[in-house]
């Protein structure tokens, strides 16, 4: 009995071992099956997209590629509209380059390669469709390496983060997907099976291409959008605790302690300094290194760092609920809770105004604010009709005109030197004032202010020399400008209608082109930020008032009636709206904005330092010292207003 018991007990471990072996062997096919299902996932997703609204296509290579090419290459059909579709290359050529056969079923590898070719087509569509680039005479490797070396200054063995963002920018524009909420690049790479921090390589880039094409056909926005996805907030919270999927009870306790003790919102770059001064603020339970690392990683993802963005209540509702007017229920509040916790955790809304990362202006803000600005500019330019009040007093007209000329010189040169040029050179982006060190971050403003002081100093020397030394008995040739034309001659009858008409036409054409350039500059400024739009509008408005007053005087002196001159002046000012909407449409790219700002700064400097100073130095009047004071008052007022805007522009509410 004892022997049998020992024998039976000795068989138990052997039985368990054999069971383990058999279970392992039986598990292997299931694992292989799961991998097989994963490898065919992109093909299944693509078939589902291609069959949307139609009969499911048979898995036939030629027909599927043709359907895919039509949906990708024909925007009108892709958006559900009817119209002719002219493909820039044949589906058969696309299939052959990808290594597929006409009659066989479409394989996963071929789908991925075709997707990569379609990405290349989207990026180089203009060259391909204009016959400058022929896709049929190149091998697949050529297109693969072309995408990997999209940026010449980066490693051509991997598709870097910047190159991926470039491709996604092309696809967003090509497929015209909504940019309110976008799938982030890291999520897209993870969905494509890319785990390397360096990005996709030769083997994984086709998988990434297939995911991009499939999601884009589904209308999913990819890359950097105007608002983050709802998942971002939860990922931020988990990454701050060095967790990925689950939280332990101790980590939840750590999160609560952090929220309770971060009421003062100490930023990571101030922790070490404040530890010496305020030891009571930081408790032993807090670990700020996690927050620092997560902030650093996220800030490198793209041009906008969501970690330092203070979202409004309306923006949080738009992110999580996709609605703005409905009441927020308890279930809605549960969905929004990660966003609220993330805002408390990141302390974004407690940062100084000039350190908060601001969202780019929305389309409604850009078009709304800029339209109001140009409308005010048009109404301001009509102040030239105020000349009617000074028909009987030419001297008062000259004094008022010189006040506005000085104001125009101050605002134009101030906007160019204190705002536009620093923005083009990237000096605004470096502004991150440290507490108690305001003068260090604004150093370039004080240096440029010294430059303006030099301009003003030499103007004073020249003006005083003219007032004290030069005889005042003869006008210089420059005194024959429109601004000094006798008011009494404005209504004089025409002597030569043809010449007068030609002069009026020249004035109107010049005004129209000038207003068009002003509108272009305002459009680019409001595309950059509301602050830039305000400063540029103020500068242009101060310049337009004396400019239009002078032109209005010329129109009256050319023989036009008062009503006709007002109407012509108003019509020429409407070209500013044309320039505005062109500027808004072409300046979405920051690079285009910089070039428009560069040309605008040059135009402002020319007007303020070349065209207008002769009016200020050589104008004749019976009260020269009064004019001298008014000119300097206008200059100082213009420069002072732009200086205050340059210092406090970050505090202007959007």
From Swiss-Prot:
One of its GO terms (cellular component) is plasma membrane. InterPro entries: ZIP, ZIP4_12_EF-hand, ZIP4_N, ZIP_Transporter. It catalyses: Zn(2+)(in) = Zn(2+)(out). Pfam families: EF-hand_Zip, Zip, ZIP4_domain. Keywords: Ion transport, Membrane, Transmembrane, Transmembrane helix, Transport, Zinc, Zinc transport. It comes from Macaca fascicularis (Crab-eating macaque). One of its GO terms (molecular function) is monoatomic cation:bicarbonate symporter activity. GO terms for biological process: intracellular monoatomic cation homeostasis; neural tube formation; neuron projection extension; zinc ion import across plasma membrane. Residues 229-369, 420-448, 523-565, 611-626 are cytoplasmic. A motif (XEXPHE-motif) lies at residues 543-548. The keyword DNA repair does not apply. Its main location: membrane. It is found in: Membrane. It is a multi-pass membrane protein. Residues 1-207, 391-398, 470-501, 587-589, 648-654 are extracellular. Belongs to the ZIP transporter (TC 2.A.5) family. Uniporter that promotes Zn(2+) import from the extracellular space to the cytoplasm across the cell membrane. The transport activity is temperature dependent. May play a role in neurulation and neurite extension. May play a key role in maintaining intracellular zinc content at levels that reduce the inhibitory effects of rises in oxidative stress on spermatogonia and spermatozoa viability during spermatogenesis. The keyword Manganese does not apply. This is Zinc transporter ZIP12. PANTHER family: SOLUTE CARRIER FAMILY 39, ZINC TRANSPORTER ZIP12. The chain crosses the membrane at residues 208-228, 370-390, 399-419, 449-469, 502-522, 566-586, 590-610, 627-647.
């Amino acid at each position: 009995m004892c022997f049998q018991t020992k024998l039976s007990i000795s068989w138990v471990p052997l039985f368990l071992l054999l069971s383990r072996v058999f279970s392992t062997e039986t598990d292997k096919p299931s694992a292989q099956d799961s991998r097989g299902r994963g490898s065919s996932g992109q093909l299944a997703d693509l078939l589902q997209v291609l069959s949307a609204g139609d009969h499911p296509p048979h898995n036939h290579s030629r027909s599927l590629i043709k359907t895919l090419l039509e949906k990708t290459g024909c925007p009108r059909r892709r958006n559900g509209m009817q119209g002719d579709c002219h493909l820039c290359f044949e589906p058969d050529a696309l299939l052959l380059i990808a290594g597929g056969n006409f009659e066989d079923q479409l394989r996963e590898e071929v789908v991925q390669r075709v997707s990569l070719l379609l990405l290349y087509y989207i990026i180089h569509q203009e060259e391909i469709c204009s016959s400058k680039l022929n896709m049929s005479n190149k091998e697949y490797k050529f297109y693969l390496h072309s995408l990997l070396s999209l940026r010449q200054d980066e490693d051509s063995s991997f598709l870097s983060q910047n190159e991926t963002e470039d491709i996604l920018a092309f696809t967003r524009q090509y497929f015209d997907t909504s940019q309110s909420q976008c799938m982030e690049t890291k999520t897209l790479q993870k969905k494509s099976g890319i785990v390397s921090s360096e990005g996709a390589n030769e083997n994984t880039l086709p998988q990434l291409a297939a995911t991009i094409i499939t999601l884009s056909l589904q209308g999913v926005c990819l890359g950097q959008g105007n608002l983050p996805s709802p998942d971002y907030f939860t990922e931020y919270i988990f990454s701050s605790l060095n967790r990925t999927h689950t939280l332990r009870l101790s980590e939840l306790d750590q999160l609560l302690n952090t929220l309770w003790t971060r009421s003062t919102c100490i930023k990571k770059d101030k922790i070490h300094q404040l530890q010496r001064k305020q030891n009571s603020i930081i408790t032993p339970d807090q670990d700020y290194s996690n927050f620092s690392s997560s902030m650093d990683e996220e800030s490198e993802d793209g041009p906008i760092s969501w970690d330092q963005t203070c979202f409004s209540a309306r923006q949080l509702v738009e992110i999580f609920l996709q609605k703005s007017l409905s009441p927020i229920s308890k279930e809605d509040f549960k969905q929004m809770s990660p966003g609220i916790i993330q805002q408390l955790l990141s302390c974004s809304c407690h940062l100084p105004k000039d350190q908060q990362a601001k969202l780019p202006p929305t389309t409604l803000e850009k078009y709304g604010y800029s339209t109001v600005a140009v409308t005010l500019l048009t109404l301001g330019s009509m102040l030239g009709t105020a000349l009617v009040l000074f028909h009987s007093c030419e001297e008062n007209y000259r004094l008022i005109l010189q006040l506005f000329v000085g104001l125009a010189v101050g605002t134009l040169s101030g906007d160019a030197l204190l705002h536009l040029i620093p923005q083009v050179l990237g000096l605004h982006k470096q502004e991150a004032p440290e507490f108690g060190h305001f003068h260090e971050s604004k150093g370039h403003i004080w240096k440029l202010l010294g430059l303006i002081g030099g301009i003003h100093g030499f103007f004073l020397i020249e003006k005083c020399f003219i007032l004290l030394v030069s005889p005042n008995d003869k006008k210089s040739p420059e005194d024959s400008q429109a601004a000094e034309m006798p008011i009494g001659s404005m209504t004089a009858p025409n002597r030569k209608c043809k010449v007068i008409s030609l002069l009026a036409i020249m004035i109107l054409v010049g005004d129209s082109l000038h207003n068009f350039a002003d509108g272009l500059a305002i459009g680019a400024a409001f595309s950059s930020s509301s602050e830039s739009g305000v400063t540029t509008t103020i500068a242009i408005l101060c310049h337009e008032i004396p400019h239009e007053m002078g032109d209005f005087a010329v129109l009256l002196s050319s023989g036009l009636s008062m009503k006709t001159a007002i109407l012509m002046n108003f019509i020429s000012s409407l070209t500013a709206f044309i320039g505005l909407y062109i500027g808004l449409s072409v300046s979405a790219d920051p690079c285009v904005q910089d070039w428009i700002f560069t040309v605008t700064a040059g135009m402002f400097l020319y007007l303020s330092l070349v065209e207008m100073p002769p009016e200020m130095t050589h104008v004749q009047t019976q009260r020269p010292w009064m004019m001298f004071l008014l000119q300097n008052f206008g200059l100082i007022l213009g420069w002072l207003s732009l200086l205050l805007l340059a210092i406090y522009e970050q505090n202007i509410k959007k």
